[in-house]
A protein has these predicted regions:
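C-terminal soluble interaction/assembly domains
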Residues: 293-299, 372, 693-701, 707, ...
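Gram-negative/organellar outer-membrane beta-barrel architecture
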Residues: 162, 279-280, 299-532, 623-624, ...
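C-terminal outer-membrane beta-barrel translocator/porin domains of Gram-negative envelope proteins
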Residues: 261, 271-276, 355-359, 471-663, ...
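Bacterial N-terminal signal peptides that target proteins for export
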Residues: 1-12
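Flexible glycine-/small-residue-rich
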Residues: 46, 142-146, 157-159, 227-233, ...
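Interaction-mediating elements
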Residues: 25-312, 318-321, 333, 426, ...
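In a subset of proteins, long, contiguous C-terminal domains/tails are tracked
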Residues: 5, 530, 554-557, 561, ...
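C-terminal motif of bacterial Sec signal peptides marking the signal peptidase cleavage site
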Residues: 20-23
C-alpha cells in the first residue's frame, strides 16, 4: 500500500492546490468602490556615481506599509478566502487590506527622511497608484544623487579629564573619512563613546551630553564632523568616580528592609562589608564572583561581569546593584550595594511519561529528580535521578510483561575548574564549570536478555561568548555488560554474527570534546546559525601504553584487556549544522539542517560499539520512516529480525539533510512543509548485510527521501508538533523500484 500512496501524493497535492487557486476569488466580496490592495513596488532612479546598496533598498521596502494580504505558497490568499467565506465566524482568516487603509504620502515622507539620514541630502520621493477594477497597487520612485561622505572628524574642547578621555576614545571611532554619512552610525558612535567613558570611571556621564556638529560647506559632497560636549551638563558628569564602600547583602528579601533588620552577621571580606542574613553561602565564594573593588574606578565592564557571574551561579533569583554618591572631602566616591536574593535551593520533581512504539509495545516511565543547588555552600549543583518503567504488548492477542528498565544517575557540577594546576580567571564573563557524572542502568527483556550498563565522566564546560560553548571530558567511561541470555536469544545471535558482536561486552574509555555555536539569541538577525561538532576517542592511550609495556601487537581476535574485559578502540566525529532564514515580518522561516558523522574502529576493535553507532529514521530524523529502521545502505532487514523489537539498524557513517518551510496559519497554529533525506552505512563489508558498505559510486542512490506536511501549536512555552510524512525513495527496494 505504501508505494501507490507515495506515487499518488504529488498528484493529489497538485490537484488540491489547483482547486484552491481556482476557488479563491476574493474580490467578489468587496463592497462597491472598494479596491483590494495588492502591494507596492519600489524603483530607485540612480544618478551616475550612486552606489548599489541592497541594505538601503530593503530598509526602504520595509517602510511600504501596510503589508498586503498574505498568500499560501505564493499562489492564493488562503486566509483572506477563509475570512470571506466566514468559516468559524471568520476567526480562521484575516480581513482584506484595502487601498483606503494605505497612506502613500506618509510612506513617501518616511522614505525621504530615511534617505536624508543616510546622507542622500538631495533626493525626491514620489508615488503613483495603479488601479484596476477591484485591485490596486502603489509604485514608489526615489531619485538618488551620490550620497555625502565624511570629510574630517575632530574633537573640540580644552584639555580636561573629560576632554582628554574623550580624545583617547577616538582611537576606536566608527567615523572614518570617506565613509558614507549615516545618522545611525553617529548614534552608534555616541553610544560607543559613552560606554568607553564609563569604563574610565565617568559614572554620571550620558550619551545625550555629546553633540555632533556637521558642516557640508566644504563642498565635494563631504561632511566635516566636529564632536563636542554640550554646555551646561551636570558637574558630576565630568568627574571620575571610584568606589569608597562596597556592601554585599546575602539573603536579601523584598519583604523586609535588609539594612534595618537585625540578625545579619557582618564580616569584612576582601575590603567589602558582607552582610549575611541566611548563612547559606560561604562569603569568600561569593566574593570570587564580584569584580567591584574598593578604591578602583567605576567600570561598566566590571559591573556587567559581576551581574553575569552572580546570576550564572544558578542560586540567585534576583541580583541587583545600587550605587550611591558618597562624596567625601570633595572626592567623587561611590558606595555600591549588591543585593542577593536566593532561589529555592532544594527541589524534587516527578515526571510520568507514556511510551508507545511502532512494534505494539507500550508502558509508563516514571522519573524522579532531586536537585540541591548549594550542596557545599558554594553553588555546587547536585542532581540525583531515579527512573523506572516497563513495556507490555497491546493488540494482536498478546499479553504479559515484555521488558522493564531501571536506572540511577548522580551528577555534581562545580562553579569553577578543578585542575591539578592553577588557572587564571580568564573566563570571567561566564562561570566555568566542572562536572562529574555516574550512572547505573538495568534493561531486562524477559524473553531475550538482561543488560547492565555503567556510565561515568569527568569534564569541563565553559562559554567563550554568548554564542560559543566548549564541553571537554578528559575522562568518559562506559561499560555495557550482557548479564543473562535465554536459549531463544542465543539461537538468534548464532544465526547473526553481526548482531552477536553488537551485543558483546563493551568497555569504552577515552576523552571527548564538543563545540557549540548558536546565535539564535541575537534577535536582530534575519539569519541564524547553529553548529554542533564533536570528536569522541576511546582506547587509544590505553592501547599505546599496553603496546609499549607488553611489546605484543593486539588485534580484534586477540585484544588487549582491562579489568579482564576487552575495550573498544575507535575515533568518531559528528556535526550538526542548522540554518534558519526568517522573513522580515518574522512570520515565515526556512529551516535547513545537515547532519554528518563517521566512526572508525581500529586496533583493539573491528566494529564500533553499538551505543556509538549512528541511526536514521523517526520524528527527529527522516520522518517518513520508523525510528532506527533505515539502512545501512540498501540492506533490507529480514522478516525474522524485523519481528524482534530490540533489533535496530545502526552504522558507522551517517548523512542526513532536512529542509522545512514554516508559515503561520491562524492564531497559535502554524504550518510546515518539509523534505527529509538520509541514510547510514558501514565502513567495512558485512557478509550478513549485503549493500551496507559505503561506496562513493552508489551512496547517492541509497539515500532515502521523504516529504510531508505538519502543523505546530505554538504555545510560547512549548510547541506541540504533528507531522504526516510519506516516503518518496526507499533504498532497501530493488533498483528501479525505489521511487
Amino acid at each position: 500500500m505504501r508505494e501507490p500512496l507515495t506515487r499518488a501524493f504529488p498528484a493529489v497535492l497538485a490537484a488540491f492546490l489547483a482547486v484552491m487557486a481556482a476557488g479563491c476569488s476574493n474580490t467578489a466580496y468587496l463592497a462597491q468602490g472598494e479596491k483590494l490592495y495588492t502591494g507596492a513596488h519600489l524603483t530607485l532612479e540612480k544618478k551616475p556615481g550612486t552606489p548599489d546598496d541592497d541594505v538601503l533598498e530593503d530598509q526602504l521596502e520595509q517602510l511600504m506599509l501596510p503589508e498586503p494580504n498574505g498568500t499560501f505558497l505564493g499562489l492564493f490568499h488562503l486566509k483572506l478566502w477563509l475570512y470571506n467565506i466566514g468559516l468559524f465566524g471568520k476567526s480562521l482568516g484575516e480581513p482584506p487590506v484595502l487601498l483606503s487603509s494605505v497612506a502613500p504620502a506618509r510612506v513617501a515622507r518616511r522614505m525621504y527622511s530615511l534617505l536624508q539620514n543616510k546622507g542622500y541630502f538631495q533626493t525626491e520621493v514620489s508615488y503613483t497608484i495603479q488601479a484596476e477594477e477591484k485591485t490596486a497597487e502603489i509604485l514608489y520612485t526615489a531619485e538618488l544623487l551620490p550620497p555625502y561622505r565624511i570629510g574630517s572628524v575632530t574633537v573640540k574642547g580644552e584639555s580636561s579629564p573629560l576632554a582628554d578621555s574623550l580624545r583617547a576614545t577616538m582611537r576606536e571611532t566608527l567615523l572614518h573619512p570617506g565613509d558614507p554619512y549615516d545618522l545611525d552610525t553617529l548614534a552608534q558612535e555616541r553610544s560607543r563613546i559613552d560606554a568607553a567613558l564609563k569604563e574610565r570611571g565617568f559614572f554620571h556621564f550620558a550619551p545625550e551630553f555629546l553633540l555632533f556638529e556637521a558642516d557640508s560647506s566644504a563642498g565635494d559632497r563631504n561632511v566635516d564632523i566636529a564632536l563636542t560636549v554640550k554646555k551646561g551638563i551636570p558637574p558630576q558628569a565630568t568627574r571620575i568616580y571610584t568606589f569608597g564602600g562596597l556592601t554585599v547583602l546575602s539573603g536579601y528579601s523584598l519583604r523586609r528592609d535588609s539594612l534595618a533588620v537585625p540578625g545579619g552577621d557582618t564580616v569584612d571580606v576582601d575590603g567589602a562589608s558582607y552582610v549575611d542574613f541566611d548563612k547559606k553561602f560561604e562569603p569568600a565564594f561569593i566574593m570570587r564572583s564580584i569584580f567591584l573593588k574598593r578604591g578602583q574606578p567605576y567600570s561598566r565592564t566590571n559591573h556587567d561581569l559581576t551581574l553575569n557571574r552572580l546570576m550564572n551561579l544558578g542560586v540567585f533569583k534576583f541580583v541587583n546593584i545600587r550605587y550611591d554618591d558618597a562624596d567625601s572631602a570633595g572626592l567623587p566616591l561611590l558606595d555600591a550595594h549588591i543585593y542577593l536574593t536566593p532561589v529555592l535551593l532544594k527541589t524534587i520533581r516527578f515526571e510520568l511519561q507514556g511510551v508507545s512504539k511502532s512494534n505494539n509495545l507500550a508502558g509508563p516511565v516514571l522519573t524522579s529528580t532531586f536537585r540541591n543547588r548549594n550542596l557545599l555552600r558554594g553553588a555546587e549543583l547536585f542532581t540525583l535521578s531515579l527512573d523506572g518503567g516497563f513495556e507490555t504488548p497491546f493488540g494482536g492477542g498478546q499479553s504479559g510483561l515484555n521488558s522493564y528498565q531501571a536506572g540511577i544517575e548522580a551528577e555534581l557540577t562545580l562553579p569553577h575548574f578543578v585542575t591539578p594546576f592553577t588557572l587564571e580567571n580568564v573566563f570571567s564573563r561566564f562561570v566555568p564549570k566542572t562536572h562529574m557524572d555516574l550512572g547505573f542502568h538495568l534493561l531486562n527483556r524477559l524473553q531475550y536478555f538482561q543488560m547492565l550498563s555503567v556510565d561515568a565522566s569527568f569534564g569541563y564546560t565553559w562559554k567563550e561568548t554568548t554564542s560559543k560553548e566548549h564541553i571537554f571530558n578528559p575522562i568518559a567511561f562506559t561499560l555495557v555488560h550482557l548479564a543473562k541470555t535465554t536459549p531463544q536469544f542465543e539461537a538468534l545471535l548464532n544465526a547473526n554474527p553481526f548482531l552477536r558482536r553488537s551485543y558483546e561486552e563493551q568497555f569504552i574509555l577515552g576523552p571527548n570534546y564538543t563545540f557549540v555555536y548558536n546565535d539564535q539569541l541575537e534577535t536582530d538577525r534575519k539569519n541564524h546559525l547553529y553548529f554542533k561538532g564533536g570528536i569522541d576517542l576511546s582506547g587509544n592511550l590505553l592501547h599505546l601504553a599496553q603496546s609499549l609495556l607488553t611489546r605484543r601487537r593486539a588485534s580484534p581476535e586477540d585484544p588487549y584487556k582491562i579489568f579482564g574485559a576487552p575495550y573498544s578502540q575507535y575515533a568518531r566525529i559528528d556535526i550538526d549544522l542548522r540554518h534558519y532564514t526568517i522573513s522580515g515580518d518574522q512570520s515565515t522561516t526556512l529551516a535547513t539542517r545537515l547532519i554528518a558523522g563517521v566512526g572508525f574502529a581500529f586496533g583493539n576493535s573491528s566494529i564500533m560499539p553499538y551505543v556509538k553507532q549512528f541511526t536514521v529514521g523517526g520524528s527527529n530524523s527522516v520522518r517518513a520512516f520508523d525510528p532506527r529502521s533505515l539502512g545501512p545502505g540498501s540492506y533490507r532487514t529480514p522478516d525474522s529480525l524485523a519481528a524482534n523489537s530490540f533489533v535496530d539498524q545502526a552504522g558507522d557513517i551517517k548523512l542526513e539533510a532536512n529542509m522545512e518551510y514554516r508559515f503561520p496559519l491562524v492564531s497559535i497554529l502554524r504550518g510546515a512543509l518539509f523534505v527529509d533525506a538520509g541514510n547510514i552505512w558501514l565502513v567495512r563489508d558485512d557478509p550478513a548485510r549485503p549493500g551496507a558498505k559505503f561506496r562513493g559510486s552508489t551512496f547517492l542512490d541509497q539515500i532515502a527521501v521523504g516529504t510531508g506536511f505538519g502543523i505546530r501549536f505554538d504555545l510560547s512555552f512549548f510547541v506541540l508538533r504533528l507531522d504526516l510524512a510519506f516516503p518518496l525513495r526507499v533504498p532497501s527496494l530493488p533498483e528501479g523500484e525505489r521511487w
